[in-house]
Amino acid sequence: MSFRKVEKKPTEMGRNMTHEKSDSDSDNEGAPMTVGGYTEFVARSDSDWDEPVYSGKARSNYNLTGTAKGTGPINSFSRKHFPNY
């Protein structure tokens, strides 16, 4: 009886949690994933691109556009775009 009850509890809890998480996951993961993923991609691209082909031109242009202008508007736009979060 005890074993059966324990097995039934996690199954039901997991099922409920999964369903609830899925609903919130869509909205919750949407904002952070976009912001974090985009930020990481930009930073990585900047460092990676800055060394190989583009040395000075891309660095000045990309850095200014991606770092200064990107950090501000991206954060503001992300918040405005995701009013649910």
From Swiss-Prot:
GO terms for biological process: leaf senescence; regulation of starch metabolic process; response to cytokinin; response to ethylene; response to hydrogen peroxide; response to jasmonic acid; response to oxidative stress; response to wounding. Expressed predominantly within leaves and cotyledons vasculatures. Mainly observed in fully expanded leaves, at the base of mature inflorescences, in senescing leaves and cauline leaves, and, to a lower extent, in hypocotyls and rosette leaves prior to flowering. Residues 58-77 have a biased composition (Polar residues). Residues 1-35, 55-85 are annotated as: Disordered. Induction: Accumulates upon light induced oxidative stress and after hydrogen peroxide H(2)O(2) treatment. Induced by drought. Negatively influenced by QQS. Reduced levels in response to cytokinin (CK) and methyl jasmonate (MeJA), but increased levels in response to ethylene (ET). Disruption phenotype: Reduced accumulation of starch content. Plays a role in carbon allocation, including during senescence and stresses, thus impacting starch accumulation. This is Senescence-associated and QQS-related protein. It comes from Arabidopsis thaliana.
